[in-house]
């Protein structure tokens, strides 16, 4: 499946425990069909406590974002509404992403 959500897109979560949350895509993982969204699907990860060279301790319980499946998010257009993503070829022969609902470029 081709992932139409790219890094830097603003998306809204349409399913799951964070339904309705908006965030920016930090990373996209096309092979797994997942995206990492800022502030969404936060999990607590237990990491080993270690000491740095300066003597500071790092680790413990860390809260971070976990990837979410691309089918559970929709790209937000310039009007702030969720939309599906389509493609068209512009006059220069470049492939451009467009919002299916309005036809505007993303």
From Swiss-Prot:
GO terms for biological process: translation. It comes from the Bacteria. SUPFAM superfamilies: Translation proteins SH3-like domain. PROSITE patterns: RIBOSOMAL_L24 (PS01108). Keywords: Ribonucleoprotein, Ribosomal protein, RNA-binding, rRNA-binding. Part of the 50S ribosomal subunit. This is Large ribosomal subunit protein uL24. It comes from Salinispora arenicola (strain CNS-205). The gene is rplX.
